[in-house]
Each structure stands twice: as C-alpha cells, then as structure tokens.
C-alpha cells in the first residue's frame, strides 16, 4: 500500500510524491491509499514470460518500478522500455545519472524527439534537465 497524492480526484498529476506545485497554483494535498505490486510479481501471477514494450509514466517513481522488475530484466525478458524524465524526478530525488547507470550494461538509451531518436552514448551533466522528456531503453542483444 502507498499514498497517492493529487490536486483533485482523477487528476493526471497524481504521484506517490507529495509534490510542491505552488508555483503553478496547484495544491497537491488530496491523498488516497492505493495497492501496489511489482512488475516481477505481476508477471509471475499472470504468467507473463516476456514484455516487448513497457511504457512507464508514474510521475517520478519510474526507477523504483524498474527495480521491481529485477527478475524480468536480469533474465532478458523485457526488450524496450519507454520512460519519462522531468519535474517529478525533483520530488523523487532521482537524476538522469541514476537511469543511465541502471541501464548502461544491457540497454542503449535514446531520447525521443519529434523527428526521431537521439542516442545517448555517454552520461553528461547536461542530461540533467527537469523538463519532461521521454526516453527509450532498448536491449542491446
């Protein structure tokens, strides 16, 4: 069980982090308790052996979700992962460096642009931009 915070019921801004969005005049004080699971447990319970494309948009909690897919990732059973990096990562205290280090051994990272994919070969502090952007992690093998 976890707390989920939002500005109103059904809001697309919901997050497990109580975000300070007062600079946007958004009050993030609504709270509800939700049930959560891991990708590994969900796949095991539902007999899912392989995931071709996994899209994550969990408002800053992406790295924690990925850690809950340890067995599937270690076994090479997830091929492509799309995730978002942006302002929510300020609240979760995660940096792009954390994602780069998580993926660098088995995945090639790309930033999704309007005209295609930009490969991310090496980490640089210039990647620490907290404006929402989507990334792909594509399994190397």
Residue ranges and their predicted role:
Residues 1-141:
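Phosphate/nucleotide-binding beta-alpha loop and adjacent structural elements of enzyme active sites
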